[in-house]
């Protein structure tokens, strides 16, 4: 029996992704897919995802103080602002009505399919238990889970004394692109990949100090697994975002996306 929640359901996602792919002519979809795959590869090769810190985390070599430093800065840079960016991407999908890539007869509907797909991600973020809706709660949202984790670590998210300038710069960078649908998709895809790469490593190192640290936030991040009781689904969300970027990708903006 498939125990995936409906935000992980292949049937639901297949319907959405089928519409998205077929909203473009086959040749354009193929061309855009190649361009987006090149972007994905360049991101996968980025120094962030080859950082020696990953190995140290997997080997549980970081001290609790170092982990506190990471979490405080991660909160400012990404966690606090993630649903802002995701919600704005859902809104900015209105621009698909005028997207020249999309068949004219499908442009209005395209924004709904995009919003539905992105909303699967948002529902997970907001704390909906999509297997058992009665267990849903804003207290189980990823942001509130992270705030709880900070509290367990005796960290005050409002105290920026130990927050690095780079964390603020990243938050400002995301805000700078908040009105661009395509830019937000690329930023969100990168963020999902970062979550996939680092969540398991951080969870491993955190578990050395207290198993309690691995509950809540870290229990709902990672990849979707058949038969798992967890709601982790970041790999599907990342793939969905790449599909949406393929739909609206413009070859004229190739340099812009590469620089972004």
List each language-model region with its residue ranges:
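Non-heme di-metal
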Residues: 2-260
């Amino acid at each position: 029996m498939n125990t995936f929640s409906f935000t992980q359901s292949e049937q639901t996602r297949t319907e959405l992704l089928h519409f998205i792919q077929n909203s473009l002519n086959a040749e354009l979809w193929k061309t855009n897919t190649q361009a987006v795959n090149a972007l994905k590869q360049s991101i996968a090769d980025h120094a962030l995802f080859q950082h020696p810190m990953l190995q140290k985390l997997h080997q549980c070599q970081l001290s609790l103080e170092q982990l506190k430093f990471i979490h405080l800065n991660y909160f400012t840079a990404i966690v606090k602002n993630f649903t802002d960016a995701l919600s704005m991407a859902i809104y900015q999908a209105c621009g698909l009505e005028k997207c020249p890539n999309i068949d004219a007869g499908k442009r209005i509907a395209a924004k709904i399919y995009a919003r539905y797909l992105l909303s699967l991600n948002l529902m997970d973020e907001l704390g909906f238990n999509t297997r058992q809706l009665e267990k849903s709660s804003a207290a189980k949202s990823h942001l509130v889970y992270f705030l709880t984790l900070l509290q367990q670590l005796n960290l005050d998210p409002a105290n920026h004394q130990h927050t690095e300038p780079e964390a603020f710069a990243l938050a400002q960078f995301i805000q700078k692109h908040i009105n661009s649908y395509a830019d937000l998709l690329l930023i969100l895809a990168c963020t999902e990949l970062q979550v996939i790469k680092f969540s398991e490593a951080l969870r491993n190192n955190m578990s050395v100090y207290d198993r309690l640290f691995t509950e809540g936030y870290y229990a709902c991040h990672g990849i979707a697994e058949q038969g798992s009781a967890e709601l982790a689904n970041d790999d599907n969300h990342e793939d969905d975002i790449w599909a949406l970027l393929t739909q609206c990708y413009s070859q004229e903006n190739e340099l812009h996306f590469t620089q972004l």
